[in-house]
Amino acid sequence: MSLNSNIEWTDATWNPVRGCTKISPGCKHCYAETFAERFRGVKGHPYEQGFDLRLVPEKLTEPFLWRSPKLVFVNSMSDLFQPGVPDDYIEAVCKVMVKANWHTFQVLTKRSERLRELLSGRMRFAAKQEHIWWGVSVEDQKYGLPRIGDLQETPASVRFLSIEPLLEDLGAFDLSGINWAIVGGESGPGARPMLEKWVISVRDRCYESRVPLSLIHI
């Protein structure tokens, strides 16, 4: 767990899973992959295996050791709902979050279909916890907007959108049931441009729907 996160919208990170695979354009310049691959082959380093998927069960209980309440971004270096993570392991992560209820957990995924299926079924016990926020990444219309629909169909108490990197105008989209949104562009070498009018469009949609909006990397 990192107690001092550089991510603007959270306090800390917790990574019981490491590594991921690309599934959509938003993954192209993945900061987590870039960081992890720097240490591939470095013996003893947490990312000795680079960005290959790895379960880290020894990290599961870390939130219990952190007594001061924090906003905790779950799996900043992975995606909890990717296919290689077993249902049983996801359930174990959910049980920790439910018990460590002095923290507020932020769970973000691009695998929105699996999120919806599990939280509507065996993980329903975690879905309605007000201290667990469930979110999806949205970068464009083709891949991002369907994730919003999946999230809206998920029986969660708190739903949020990470609209970053914003790669095109999202047009008109429904924000019913969404509690918070973040919008931002890419940063670093090779960052793809984000147009001001795209951000204004998202801002206007949030204003009309009374959804709080955080702007980053503008």
Regions found by a protein language model. Give the residues of each.
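Conserved AdoMet/S-adenosylmethionine-binding subsite of the radical SAM
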Residues: 55-212
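N-terminal [4Fe-4S]-dependent radical SAM core
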Residues: 1-72, 79
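Conserved small/polar residues in nucleotide/adenosyl-binding loops
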Residues: 216-218
